[in-house]
Amino acid sequence: VGFKAGVKDYKLTYYTPEYNPKDTDILAAFRVTPQPGVPAEEAGAAVAAESSTGTWTTVWTDGLTSLDRYKGRCYDIEPVAGEESQFIAYVAYPLDLFEEGSVTNMFTSIVGNVFGFKALXXLRLEDLRIPPAYSKTFQGPPHGIQVERDKLNKYGRPLLGCTIKPKLGLSAKNYGRAVYECLRGGLDFTKDDENVNSQPFMRWRDRFLFCAEAIYKAQAETGEIKGHYLNATAGTCEEMMKRAIFARELGVPIVMHDYLTGGFTANTSLARYCRDNGLLLHIHRAMHAVIDRQKNHGMHFRVLAKALRMSGGDHIHAGTVVGKLEGERDITLGFVDLLRDDFVEKDRSRGIYFTQDWVSLPGVIPVASGGIHVWHMPALTEIFGDDSVLQFGGGTLGHPWGNAPGAVANRVALEACVQARNEGRDLAREGNEIIRSAAKWSPELAAACEVWKEIKFEFPAMDTL
C-alpha cells in the first residue's frame, strides 16, 4: 500500500514556515484561539488543512492528486500582544482552489467548516489578500465612484441621504410623500429601510411607483438629480430581478440590496444587471454584526467589505466613527480605504494585514449612517471626505418642523462644512463654531441645533495620526 492509514498531525503537511507566498495566492490572516494543550503550529496547520484539501484522516485518493499544488499552507504564526491564548496564523491558498468570479465559493472554502473545528476554541478571519489574478475574474461594483458622480452631476462634497422612518407601517402614498419632502429640502438620496421589502401594509410595486413620482417632482423643483434607494431584496432571486427590472422601467437611478441576508450569489447577479442597465446599487449590511461583532470569532467587517467590492455594489454602510474611540476610528478608515482606493498599503495599526492592489476595480462609496445629526457634520466631513454618503434618518425626520426643513438643515450644515474646509479651516477644532455661524442665517438649521444640542468631539485633529 502506498500510504499509511490513520489519523495524522496536520503540521507535518500543512505547516510550512519556509514557504514564500506566490503573487497569485489568496492570503488569509486568522486570529486563532486553540483549545488548551493544542500547540500553535498544529492549530494553524489545522486551519490551513480544513479550509483547503485536508480531512481528518489519510485517504488513499490523496495519491491521485498533487497535494503540493492544491493544499493551503500555514506559512507564518505571530503572537497577539496582550493575549496569551491567541495568535495570528497566516495561510496561503493556491488560486486553483476557487471558482472564478464567485465570492460564494471563496467563502465556502475559507470560512466554511473550519469554523466549527473542535481543536479550536474560537477562530476569526481578520483579513484577506485578494490577488489581481482573482479580482480580475469579478466585475466588481456596477459603476464606481467617478461614474456615479458623473451620472448624478454632483462634485466636491459628500452626498446626503436619509432613511425613511417609521420604517414599517406607512402606506405607499404617505411613504412617497415623505421621500418627496426630503428630496425637495435638499437631500440627494432617500432610502428604503433594509426591512422594507414587500409587506402587507405596503407592497413593493406601489412603493416603487410613488417613490418614482416623488423623485421626478423633486427633480423638477430643485433642478438637481435625485434618487431613492428602492430595496429590491426579495425571497427569491427571480423576484429580486423582477423588482430591479421594474425600477429600471420607471427610469430611477438607483436600487438597493441587503447583501448578507440576500446572499452573495443573488448580489452578484443583481450587480451585473445594474451594470448592464445603468442602475446604481446601494448595499446595506444587515446581519453583519452577527458575523463581525465578536472580537475572537467570526470575520472582521473589512473582509465582508472586500467581498462586497468583488461581488458588486456602489454604496455600502460602513459605520459612523463619530464619538467612538480613536483606535476604532483608524480601523474604520482602514476598511473605508479598502473600499475606495485602488492600492492600499499594509498597515497593522489600521487593521490592514496585507497590501491590497485592486488593479482598477471600481471603488465603493462608504455610507455613514446611524444616530448622527447636524452637530456631527464637521466631524463626518473631516473623517470621510468627499467620497461618502452621510445618511441622517432621525437626524432629518426628527426635525421639529418636519422633513423638508430637516433636509434643509442638513444641506446647509454640509455646505457650510465643505466651504469651511475649502477655506482651510480646521473642522475638528472649529466644528461647533462653523455650525453655529451657519445657523444664524438658516432658521431650519438653528431649530435643528436646538433639538440635538452640541456634541463633544472625543478626538483631536486628524493630523495627529
From Swiss-Prot:
Residues involved in Mg(2+) binding: 191, 193-194
Subunit comment: Heterohexadecamer of 8 large chains and 8 small chains; disulfide-linked. The disulfide link is formed within the large subunit homodimers.
Record-level GO BP terms: photorespiration; reductive pentose-phosphate cycle
Superkingdom, taxonomy of origin: Eukaryota
Protein location: Plastid, Chloroplast
CDD domains referenced in this protein's UniProt entry, alphabetically: RuBisCO_large_I
Amino acids binding substrate: 113, 163, 167, 285, 317, 369
Transmembrane segments: none
Gene name per UniProt: rbcL
Coiled-coil positions: none
Protein name per Swiss-Prot or TrEMBL: Ribulose bisphosphate carboxylase large chain
Further comment: The basic functional RuBisCO is composed of a large chain homodimer in a 'head-to-tail' conformation. In form I RuBisCO this homodimer is arranged in a barrel-like tetramer with the small subunits forming a tetrameric 'cap' on each end of the 'barrel'.
Listed HAMAP family: RuBisCO_L_type1
Active site, renumbered: 165, 284
Enzyme class per UniProt: lyase
Species for this entry: Passiflora quadrangularis (Grenadine)
Described purpose of this protein according to its UniProt entry: RuBisCO catalyzes two reactions: the carboxylation of D-ribulose 1,5-bisphosphate, the primary event in carbon dioxide fixation, as well as the oxidative fragmentation of the pentose substrate in the photorespiration process. Both reactions occur simultaneously and in competition at the same active site.
Cofactor(s) required, per the database record: Mg(2+)
Site, Transition state stabilizer: residue positions: 324
